């Protein structure tokens, strides 16, 4: 059963149809990528799934519930987590204060907040950084904190916006391992990133979008060997 589905999504700006009847799906314990050249409509599609941009037509279903008109906050309450491309941590706060800032928005007891805090710190291997100020963290530590914050609401689904952007190769590898671990725990994951190799190396499937439509979908091998994908996006010399 699919956890997230979009059905015939349409988004127009003036006379320009940026997304043109686009349908994608992501199941539980599955990592799916959205790829495509600049202006293809992939980011718009992703933001419609998140709830930042409203669709002009079509449907978005989460766990079989129609969420097309629901806000990003309502989607979060249903079990969707979102990791933005922009830095989302409070640099002047400690690691545990950053996590507690979100925990305090939940309707749970102080004891449960403390338990959840300790559990999250341990799960993402940042317990030793609990009292460190966020501005002192390395790139890898900061990305772990950002992912931890996205997990505070205990989501069943994560939307990751450019998770490999602006970080060193060693940090990319760490982020990939975290994402694969989340998949192993049963989360469905939709990610979009301009780093094609890094994305295809961990996705079960990917959609390549061009001119607001799906050009091809399938495994990394399917995309790499597709003539149209090479012509429009990957190039003839692309190799994993």
Indicate where each model-derived feature is located:
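Catalytic Walker B motif of ABC-type/P-loop ATPase nucleotide-binding domains
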Residues: 158-162
């Amino acid at each position: 059963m699919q956890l997230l589905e979009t059905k015939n999504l349409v988004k127009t700006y003036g006379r320009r149809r940026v997304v043109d009847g686009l349908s994608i799906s992501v199941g539980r314990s599955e990592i799916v990528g959205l790829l495509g050249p600049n202006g293809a409509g992939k980011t718009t599609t992703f933001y419609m799934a998140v709830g930042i941009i409203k669709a002009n037509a079509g449907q978005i279903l989460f766990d079989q519930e129609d969420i097309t008109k629901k806000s990003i906050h309502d989607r979060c309450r249903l079990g969707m987590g979102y990791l933005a491309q922009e830095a989302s941590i409070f640099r002047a706060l400690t690691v545990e204060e950053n996590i507690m800032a979100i925990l305090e928005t939940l309707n749970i007891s102080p004891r449960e907040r403390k338990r959840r805090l300790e559990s999250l710190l341990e799960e993402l291997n940042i317990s030793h950084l609990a009292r460190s100020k966020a501005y002192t963290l390395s790139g890898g530590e900061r990305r772990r904190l950002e992912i931890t914050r996205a997990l505070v609401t205990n989501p069943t689904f994560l939307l990751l916006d450019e998770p490999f952007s602006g970080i060193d190769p060693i940090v990319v590898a760490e982020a990939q391992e975290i994402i694969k671990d989340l998949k192993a725990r049963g989360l469905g994951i939709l990610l979009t990133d301009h780093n094609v190799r890094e994305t295809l190396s961990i996705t079960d499937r990917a959609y390549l979008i061009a001119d607001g439509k799906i050009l091809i979908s399938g495994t990394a091998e399917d995309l790499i060997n597709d003539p149209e994908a090479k012509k429009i996006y990957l190039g003839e010399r692309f190799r994993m």
